[in-house]
């Protein structure tokens, strides 16, 4: 709320989904009940993704409907949270979404980029990457996941989100724009009035002149 007032609102706790095994078999990590406004997450999802998913479902609760928008809202909220676990989750998930998007248009570039990233990470981050991949690779082979994806995609499309499941990954466009505007451009900006020790309007040179 401090950085993004749009998030000011309900602070009701995010609940734990019951029947976790069923939701896990369908590849569902979180859910927002439209009729009650309750947000819940699947406790069996990878730990590293839970803070981000909590923020994602809370975004839905605040009527941020489209998945790409809810994902971006989750990134902003989690990355601004003073809790470092939320910050870590935000950037971890942003990385995963962007790498997945890159792999669809330039698979070898994605492989090369991931190799460079993973070569420099510590063992804890590498463990989270392995666990995250293992969770989703296992679920992809389950029939229930395919059915769940189809139902979810159809639901999103009938709700006005024409991209269906692809909407989740479209957050990459927003993430890249945010990085350019908030990180890249400010770092390239030239200081308007750089300090010049010989500029008489910035420094009193009287003492230097008299000392000659």
Language-model segments: residues:
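Generic structural signal for hydrophobic core residues of well-folded globular domains
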Residues: 45, 58, 62, 77-78, ...
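Second-shell loop/turn segments in exported
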Residues: 40-44, 55-63, 84-85
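Pan-zinc metallopeptidase signature
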Residues: 124-212
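Active-site recognition of the HExxH zinc-binding catalytic motif
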Residues: 52-71, 75-76
């Amino acid at each position: 709320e401090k950085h993004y007032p749009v998030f000011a609102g309900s602070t009701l706790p995010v609940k734990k989904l019951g029947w976790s095994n069923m939701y896990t078999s369908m590849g569902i990590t979180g859910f927002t009940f439209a009729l009650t406004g309750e947000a819940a997450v699947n406790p069996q999802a990878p730990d590293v993704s839970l803070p981000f998913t909590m923020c994602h479902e809370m975004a839905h609760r605040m009527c941020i409907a489209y998945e790409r928008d809810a994902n971006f809202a989750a990134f902003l909220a989690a990355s601004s949270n003073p809790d470092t676990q939320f910050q870590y989750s935000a950037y971890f998930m942003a990385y995963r979404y962007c790498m997945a998007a890159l792999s669809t248009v330039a698979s070898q570039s994605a492989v090369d980029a991931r190799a460079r990233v993973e070569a420099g990470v510590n063992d804890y981050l590498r463990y989270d990457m392995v666990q995250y991949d293992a969770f989703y690779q296992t679920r992809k082979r389950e029939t229930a996941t395919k059915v769940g994806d189809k139902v979810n995609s159809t639901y999103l499309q009938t709700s006005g989100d024409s991209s269906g499941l692809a909407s989740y990954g479209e957050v990459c466009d927003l993430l890249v724009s945010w990085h350019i505007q908030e990180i890249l451009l400010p770092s390239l900006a030239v200081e308007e009035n750089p300090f010049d020790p010989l500029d008489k309007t910035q420094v009193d040179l009287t003492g230097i002149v008299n000392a000659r």
